[in-house]
Amino acid sequence: MPLVTRNIEPRHLCRQTLPSVRSELECVTNITLANVIRQLGSLSKYAEDIFGELFTQANTFASRVSSLAERVDRLQVKVTQLDPKEEEVSLQGINTRKAFRSSTIQDQKLFDRNSLPVPVLETYNTCDTPPPLNNLTPYRDDGKEALKFYTDPSYFFDLWKEKMLQDTKDIMKEKRKHRKEKKDNPNRGNVNPRKIKTRKEEWEKMKMGQEFVESKEKLGTSGYPPTLVYQNGSIGCVENVDASSYPPPPQSDSASSPSPSFSEDNLPPPPAEFSYPVDNQRGSGLAGPKRSSVVSPSHPPPAPPLGSPPGPKPGFAPPPAPPPPPPPMIGIPPPPPPVGFGSPGTPPPPSPPSFPPHPDFAAPPPPPPPPAADYPTLPPPPLSQPTGGAPPPPPPPPPPGPPPPPFTGADGQPAIPPPLSDTTKPKSSLPAVSDARSDLLSAIRQGFQLRRVEEQREQEKRDVVGNDVATILSRRIAVEYSDSEDDSSEFDEDDWSD
């Protein structure tokens, strides 16, 4: 439907009923002439409106041109009369002055009531007025205008504004989500790109001739041929090389001790059966001593002669020596003497059986296990150990004497200070806890007030957002094309309501 801005009336000059007169021709002529004069009058009125608007716009344009001319004249005078030798501008003066910034005002609200043309306004005034429903607005509890339920000119704008603001919030939430994921997984973006599959290798193989191309059946699952030719001329199988040169990793003593025969059977056969490559035999030979050395601590007689030469055994025997002290510490009653002798000397086993006969050691054994689990609760047992440890030192006074004091002292020192610290901590912590609780209670009491203040600030922030198309669109464009985290501060509080 076209919007008629100016309508010249009357539109029809001669379409009228004639009165009962004798001279009808003269009557029609007079009526037509009168209607023409009316049309000229309405035309002159619209011409006045048109030329009046043109005059207003021309006057505004002239004032802008005159102000610009004045600025150019002043600038020209400053440029021509400025002498750089006499007047020196300091760097501070240059920095204090603000740079030129264009303040372009965007045209908006073109179809507002104030910008409504006069003829359109006259046409609008000829329409029927809406019912006076605004009189019921004071009686509404929701605060909405009653007339908007009947007619709401701003309905479409409000709908569009709500959609734009929601889209902006969604964009900001998505950006914050990506930032959070990027912080949690910094290496997520460093994904290796998928390799492009080409037939270049295939054509390179076919370049020498079809008869030299190896079929896929001849290649294993790993892409290498099953048979390998070594430099010394021997041929070995890939499976054989893997089985002999890479023996399974040695297990713990507990796992290897129950089945020594199984480990011994596995080690010797590989060199005998798969004896094609010389390197494999060497690898298996080296692997044998290592395996036998691990098994040797549990079964010394059988393991060394079968799996390993006598040479490596003494070299690898010292390392396993430290492990035995922990078992006597757990299973044998006298824990302090074994630990003291185990650290300086290599042969700890003979020392434990010499001390058990003493009756003093038979009584303390039950207490030591509980202290190992809970030192601070039972301080007396550690103190009793030095008294019991006094008799044994006479046979070898220097060695056992030093170890017990540090061991017992280390046990005794932590046992005594904890109670002191425990007694001091409650004294210092009690007032702090009471203060924290009082602060928490005061914060809870002020919860409703704080929540109200937050709601007021949120409402103020929403009101700050411009209620026009240009501001909303500029805000959305800035959010979409910006990567800074400051842009999300405006809608951070909205996450609480999600």
Curated annotation (Swiss-Prot):
Keywords, comma-separated and alphabetical: Actin-binding, Cell membrane, Cell projection, Cytoplasm, Cytoskeleton, Host-virus interaction, Membrane, Phosphoprotein
Annotated effect of mutating residue 150 to D: Constitutive induction of the formation of actin filaments. Strongly enhances formation of lamellipodia
Reported effect, residue 124 to D: Constitutive induction of the formation of actin filaments. Strongly enhances formation of lamellipodia
GO cellular component terms, semicolon-separated: actin cytoskeleton; basolateral plasma membrane; cell-cell junction; cytosol; early endosome; extracellular exosome; lamellipodium; protein-containing complex
Domain WH2: 436-453
InterPro entries: SCAR/WAVE_fam, WH2_dom
Distribution of this protein across tissues and organs: Expressed in all tissues with strongest expression in placenta, lung, and peripheral blood leukocytes, but not in skeletal muscle.
Cell location: Cytoplasm, Cytoskeleton; Cell projection, Lamellipodium; Basolateral cell membrane
Biased composition (Low complexity): 252-263
Protein name stated in the entry: Actin-binding protein WASF2
Biological source species: Homo sapiens (Human)
